């Protein structure tokens, strides 16, 4: 599997709760849609940014694990900043206007036990806020940090987001999934690049 964010293999299914097609994003995935597809993901310490151009009613979501990579891995942007650039660039390619893009951000819970100093969830939350501020993209809603994992559904056509905080019973499962993806990414070769659009 490619270590860079991807839109391939995004699982789509009929969501019974919302009676619509949903696309479930896993860590390292992102997707942009211009229809009624619900974008959904489950977050622990990871962060998902939901971006939207309200005029075109197009939006997208990413799911990243870390704000940045190790300085020595040759690709510090393959995590948070890479995820954000890919999502923004894909929206711009589809006609979104940078000055109209707005953000809703979620996740960054501190679910990994034993990480009390500079926890990854807090770092992810700080990163996404600072990144969007630097890009002049307003955050119009957020649910970041805390101790509970979350499941979110984002409806790009309306901008609606539904957040379900998961009980403590799910923490171990979410933390194990995130840890496994981190381990896989740390061993994967660095590939790909980012093309910036203004």
Curated annotation (Swiss-Prot):
EC number: 3.5.1.44
One MF term in the entry's GO annotations: protein-glutamine glutaminase activity
Gene Ontology annotations of biological process type: chemotaxis
Pfam families registered for this protein in UniProt: CheD
Keyword presence, Membrane: no
Domain of life: Bacteria
Keywords: Chemotaxis, Hydrolase
Enzyme class, spelled out: hydrolase
Gene3D superfamilies assigned to the protein according to its UniProt record, in alphabetical order: 3.30.1330.200
Catalytic activity annotation: L-glutaminyl-[protein] + H2O = L-glutamyl-[protein] + NH4(+)
SUPFAM superfamilies referenced in this protein's UniProt entry, alphabetically: CNF1/YfiH-like putative cysteine hydrolases
Family: Belongs to the CheD family.
General function of this protein: Probably deamidates glutamine residues to glutamate on methyl-accepting chemotaxis receptors (MCPs), playing an important role in chemotaxis.
Protein name, entry field: Probable chemoreceptor glutamine deamidase CheD
Organism whose genome encodes this protein: Stenotrophomonas maltophilia (strain R551-3)
């Amino acid at each position: 599997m490619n270590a860079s964010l991807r839109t391939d293999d995004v699982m789509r299914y009929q969501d019974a709760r919302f009676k619509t097609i949903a696309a479930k994003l896993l860590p390292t995935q992102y997707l942009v849609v211009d229809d009624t597809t619900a974008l959904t993901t489950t977050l622990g310490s990871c962060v998902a940014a939901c971006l939207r151009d309200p005029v075109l009613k197009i939006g997208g979501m990413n799911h990243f694990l870390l704000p940045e990579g190790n300085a020595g891995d040759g690709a510090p942007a393959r995590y948070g900043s890479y995820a954000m650039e890919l999502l923004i660039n894909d929206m711009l390619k589809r006609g979104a206007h940078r000055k109209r893009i707005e953000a809703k951000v979620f996740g960054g819970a501190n679910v990994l036990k034993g990480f009390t100093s500079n926890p990854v969830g807090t770092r992810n939350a700080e990163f996404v806020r600072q990144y969007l501020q630097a890009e002049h993209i307003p955050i119009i809603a957020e649910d970041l940090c805390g101790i509970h994992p979350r499941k979110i559904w984002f409806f790009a056509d309306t901008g609606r987001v539904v957040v379900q905080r998961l009980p403590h019973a799910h923490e171990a499962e979410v933390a194990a999934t995130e840890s496994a993806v981190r381990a896989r990414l740390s061993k994967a070769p660095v590939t790909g690049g980012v093309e910036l659009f203004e």
